[in-house]
Amino acid sequence: DVPEIKFHMEHPLMKRIVELKERNYADYGQYDYAPKDYEDAQENYDSLLEITGDINANIIGPNSEDVDAEGPHCENGRVRYASKTYENLDATIKAGLCGMTMPRRYGGLNLPNVVYTAANEIIAEGDAGFENIWSLQDCIETLYEFGDEDQRKRYIPRVCAGETMSMDLTEPDAGSDLQSVMLKATFDEKENCWRLNGVKR
């Protein structure tokens, strides 16, 4: 029901985006829910966004005040989320809302980023803090793009099954602002390795 989402989902470029992401529907018949054509894909996306909206309206949104009140805390030397955060995560995992952009061969949904971003927006409406946790699944994009096949097979299915990832920023002047990170990586051709240069806490 969000006009901005509807605008993007019905944009004329969406058909080409879907064809490219679906590799002209090459997964059809090999994986459950792999679309056979553009109309089938759009039907799948609409269903997925409706499920996301239901989870937001019935679980994530109603839990948000309790999550804020309890907050994360230290328990036996480990940081724990608020109990309702685990309820939110469980609901998204059971609904299959993990590994959304990853290929089906790793257990992902192979969604275009447009659809994943729409789901992000829906979840953020209920609890922006939880959306930050849930959307850490997109950290796996880096491994998918730059990792080797062994790494992909070891880690991507875990994220698609609902294991959470993290983004750890430890520079003194960056805080949680990823854009402020000053660490530089340069390739040392002589030693055939990457050198990191920056200040860490």
Predicted regions and their residues:
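Conserved beta-strand/loop block within the catalytic cores
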Residues: 77, 82-90, 181-187
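Solvent-exposed, flexible loop/coil residues
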Residues: 3, 9, 13, 24, ...
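Glycine-rich, Trp-frequent "lid" loop and neighboring beta-strands that shape
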Residues: 109, 150-201
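Intrinsically disordered or highly flexible coil/loop and linker segments, enriched in small
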Residues: 14-18, 22, 57-69, 94-101, ...
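Internal helix-loop-helix
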Residues: 53-54, 84-157, 161
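Glycine- and acidic
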Residues: 33-45, 69-74, 98-105, 120-126, ...
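Extended, charge-enriched "interface" segments that sit outside catalytic cores
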Residues: 1-75, 79
